[in-house]
Regions:
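A structural signal for small-residue-enriched, beta-sheet-centric alpha/beta enzyme cores
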Residues: 1-75, 79-93, 99-407
């Protein structure tokens, strides 16, 4: 496996574009297109929130139908959530506009939206934007990067990655882009991720690969405990690498899923670290657990604790908050057996041993917790299973961003 430059246009046959449609934002791009030169099989995972945005419902329908997909249209600024039949109709209007502009079937157009909930999309601006995107689409790495920028809302930076693998002597590429900064919580978190590959793989196998990996990547991040109405991860495969078909359970499948995991974990961590107002990526490793489920519950509980997140913001080794979060998680463990460590680029320090504080240096702990990426390692000494969750610190900036988000 090799990391390469680019994102959604790194794989063969994919083009992208961005444009400023003026949907909410002024003087910046707010629409993006991903286009495949040939039809793709598609897989998707979506929010578990009962309140689902219109694009989520549309995409679920398209993915379930088995239709070959050739384009994805995404807008930022307005989420098209809680907009009723009118909002769902705008998804169809978007697909129809893309079909007309690109000469493809509307049944194979996926859509995505992110932004303010409850507002109707200005559909005339959206369809005009689709026509512009169709004219501007290119296969360059730069067009992929600009597409990643166009889907940002409160994000501070674009998020993209691409890797290459070998499958039976053929080079297969996987590339992705994502957005997400707030309303991020495990269970498909407002986050959107779009992944493209030129692999030859069936729709069923592609869906298994995505579904199996989401639990260990996007579902292990949290910024604020709010599960969005719009969470969507879409994975397209156009087969242009001309590799021998990747079969579920084969060695090639293992290679493919390892590469997919690299993409998903990278994007998930970038979302977590770019949380609204955040100054640090906060990683939590639960180790020495008796089951994977126990490890995930403990890691998630710590990373979601607002008191712990504010301690990280203050570079304060307030370990009692972590032990407390473990205690109310629902997982069973012996608190008098827990060891806790903090780690960053500045070093590693043990804070508690067997549930009580060791004689550590507060100054050294503060130095370690002052880095832009900080890890807490909780060892319950019950087994060999581990899990990792990602979040961020909680600062005044989060309140400032969200107090006036609609304006």
């Amino acid at each position: 496996m090799k990391q390469i430059a680019g994102g959604v246009t790194a794989a063969k046959g994919y083009e992208a574009a961005s444009t400023a449609a003026g949907i909410k934002y002024q003087n910046r791009t707010d629409m993006a297109m991903i286009y495949s030169q040939v039809p793709c099989v598609a897989a998707g995972t979506f929010t578990t929130n009962v309140v689902k945005a219109a694009p989520v419902k549309w995409d679920q329908q398209v993915v379930k139908s088995g239709a070959k997909v050739q384009a994805v249209i995404v807008n930022s600024g307005i989420a098209n959530a809680c907009t009723g039949s009118e909002g769902f109709g705008y998804c169809k209007d978007t697909a129809d506009a893309a079909a007309a502009a690109l000469g493809i079937s509307a049944a194979g157009v996926l859509v995505g939206s992110t932004g303010v909930i409850g507002k109707q999309i200005p559909i005339e601006k959206l369809t005009a934007g689709v026509a512009e995107l169709a004219k501007k689409k290119q296969a360059t790495l730069e067009s992929g990067q600009e597409a990643a920028k166009a889907i940002m809302t409160t994000d501070t930076k674009e998020k993209e990655l691409a890797v290459e693998i070998e499958v039976a002597g053929k080079t297969v590429t996987i590339g992705g882009m994502a957005k997400g900064s707030g309303m991020i919580h495990p269970n498909m978190c407002t986050m959107l991720a779009f992944i493209t590959t030129d692999a030859v793989i069936s729709k069923e196998t592609l869906q298994k690969a995505l579904s199996e990996d989401v639990d260990d990547t996007y579902n292990m991040i949290s910024v604020d405990g709010d599960t969005s109405t719009n969470d969507t991860v879409l994975l397209l495969a156009n087969g242009m690498a001309e590799n021998e078909e990747i079969i579920y359970g084969s060695e090639a499948y293992e290679t493919f899923t390892e590469a997919l995991h690299v993409i998903n974990e990278y994007l998930a961590k970038k979302i977590a670290g770019d949380g609204e107002g955040a100054t640090a990526l906060f990683e939590v490793k639960a180790v020495g657990c008796e089951s994977k489920e126990q490890a995930k519950i403990l890691a998630k509980s710590i990373v979601c604790s607002n008191l712990t997140k504010t301690a990280i913001a203050g570079h304060d080794a307030n370990w009692g908050r972590i032990l407390c979060a473990m205690g109310y998680s629902g997982a069973q463990f012996d608190p008098e057996q827990v060891d806790l460590f903090f780690e960053s680029a500045a070093g590693k320090i043990q804070i508690i041993e067997n549930g009580t504080a060791v004689n550590y240096s507060e100054a050294e702990a503060t130095k370690i917790l002052s880095e832009p990426e900080v890890t807490a390692i909780a060892d319950v000494k019950m087994g060999e299973e581990t899990a990792t969750a990602w979040g961020c610190d909680l600062t005044h900036g989060y309140i400032e961003i969200n107090a006036d988000y609609r304006s």
